[in-house]
UniProtKB/Swiss-Prot annotation:
Residues 1-91, 142-160, 222-267 are cytoplasmic. InterPro entries: CD20-like, MS4A. Disulfide bonds: none annotated. Residues 248-267 are annotated as: Disordered. The chain crosses the membrane at residues 92-112, 121-141, 161-181, 201-221. Residues 113-120, 182-200 are extracellular. This is Membrane-spanning 4-domains subfamily A member 12. It is found in: Membrane. Belongs to the MS4A family. GO terms for biological process: cell surface receptor signaling pathway. May be involved in signal transduction as a component of a multimeric receptor complex. The keyword Transmembrane helix applies.
Length: 267
């Protein structure tokens, strides 16, 4: 015998998740489109994502989005580069002047070294070896490279200035020895007195300029070596504490929801 009571079925509520969660500043029932973006949060996110640039000499920060680290170069790089730029120009000009003086006095030494009939001229081993000419040319090249490197400050010019100044310092040291020999071997009988006197004076002058060139070349090579080695130092990498994504999700201050419905939603 069947009962006349209607069969009661459990009420089934189909819950559909809401793809547009309401926020605190939106009216109930108003849904925010997926494509809309909070411009204020986007601007704040872009400011937080961009690392701060450091303008101190020798320190550079990475500002490309998507990178997780900030690269910083050792601060001593800026000091070494500034020292080289300040000193290399003045020292290079001195080297050029010394080179021109060597070539000029070398021509005079060549003229007084000739013998006329039975009268001997000034015997110069420096002229025989050609030191006033190839030495002066080397000094001019070193000075020109130093001046160019102080203006453009490229790695190639700095290395070239370093190499040429080392060569010039060696040549200047050799020239000092040759000029000392010239001052010692002259003054024998049969030489022209005025030629010997002039030759010794010119040799002494060139020796002073050679000593000056030696110290100037060593100083320039020192500054160039500092500028070259400090730029090859390892780069300090600092982890970026900020998020690289310039768009940050809007913070929701909506009240807690029960069964996918807001607590203050109209019933």
């Amino acid at each position: 015998m069947m009962s006349s009571k209607p069969t009661s079925h459990a009420e089934v509520n189909e819950t559909i998740p809401n793809p547009y969660p309401p926020s605190s500043f939106m009216a109930p029932g108003f849904q925010q489109p997926l494509g809309s973006i909070n411009l204020e949060n986007q601007a704040q996110g872009a400011q937080r994502a961009q690392p701060y640039g450091i303008t101190s000499p020798g320190i550079f920060a990475s500002s490309q989005p998507g990178q997780g680290n900030i690269q910083m170069i050792n601060p001593s790089v800026g000091t070494a580069v500034m020292n080289f730029k300040e000193e290399a120009k003045a020292l290079g000009v001195i080297q050029i002047m010394v080179g021109l003086m060597h070539i000029g006095f070398g021509i005079v030494l060549c003229l007084i070294s000739f013998s006329f009939r039975e009268v001997l001229g000034f015997a110069s081993t420096a002229v025989i070896g050609g030191y006033p000419f190839w030495g002066g040319l080397s000094f001019i090249i070193s000075g020109s490279l130093s001046v160019s490197a102080s203006k453009e400050l490229s790695r190639c010019l700095v290395k070239g200035s370093l190499g040429m100044n080392i060569v010039s310092s060696i040549l200047a040291f050799i020239g000092v020895i040759l000029l000392l020999v010239d001052m010692c071997i002259n003054g024998v009988a049969g030489q022209d007195y005025w030629a010997v006197l002039s030759g010794k004076g010119i040799s002494a002058t060139l020796m002073i300029f050679s000593l000056l060139e030696f110290f100037v070349a060593c100083a320039t090579a020192h500054f160039a070596n500092q500028a070259n080695t400090t730029t090859n130092m390892s780069v300090l990498v600092i982890p970026n504490m900020y998020e690289s994504n310039p768009v940050t999700p809007a913070s929701s201050s909506a009240p807690p929801r029960c069964n996918n419905y807001s607590a203050n939603a109209p019933k």
